[in-house]
Amino acid sequence: LLDDGHRPEMKKLAEEYGVRYLSRATNEHAKAGNLNYGLENSHGDFICIFDADHCPQQNFITNTIGYFADKNVAFVQTPQDFYNLDSFQHRQGKNNKGLWSEQSLFFRVIQRGKDYWNAAFFCGSCAIVRRSSLESIGGFATGTLTEDLHTSIRLHKKGYRSIYMQQSMAYGIAPSNVEPFLSQRVRWGQGAMQVWKKEGILTGKGLTIAQRLNYLASVLTYFDGWQKGLFYLAPAIVLTTGIMPIEAINI
């Protein structure tokens, strides 16, 4: 249990369950620094990573470890699913059928496509990583707000493979209201820009053309806000000007 909060109650909880508790003297490099501290104070060949709110299923390791038979596989990422289905980012499907999360498109469609091009990236939780691969790039990447994306691109530059496994193996807590939701997305956007600048997605060495395009697409999604702005303004423009965005042509 890596605790950057230095909480006595967490230490006590870890002791009750026979879990090793680690807490740093400083919080340098935030989550990436905390993960690297855990890396330095452990010796396992593979590292399973879960955010504090994620609960893995008992068969997580047995279902993911087989991919590492390929010595070039650096990490296996699984979907990030949630058990608080009344969260801010969950919505009921059409005609009240099914339930989808704001992240469903990414984990059900986009990551699968990225996996085809060996460009699926580590998402910071619900994943298992090979220690030797991490050590070859100096551990979890620091210096940006998104250590997961940053670490992924460094591993891919080294020529390692990534695997995206579609089966849900862990469940966490999604943001319950708009404030933490926006804070999380702003952090992701800022981190993506930092990674772009530091790693040179288009110019840096080591990535295939397909990987460059996949990483570029992930970064450029944070420039899509203006499209939603126009979408929200469209009804007001139609009502005040009478100009329809689409004109039907009868033949």
Per-range role (PLM):
Residues G143, S152-A170:
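Catalytic donor-sugar/metal-binding loop of nucleotide-sugar-dependent glycosyltransferases
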Residues D4, T78, Q167:
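Cofactor-binding loop segments of dinucleotide-utilizing enzymes, especially the Rossmann-like FAD-
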Residues D3-M10, T26-N27:
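A conserved acidic beta->alpha catalytic loop
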Residues Q166-P180:
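Active-site donor/metal-binding and catalytic loop motifs
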Residues E15-G18, L22-F46, Q58-L145, H156-K157, ...:
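Long helical/loop segments within the catalytic core of UDP-sugar-dependent glycosyltransferases
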Residues A210-I251:
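Alpha-helical bilayer-embedded segments of polytopic membrane proteins, i.e.
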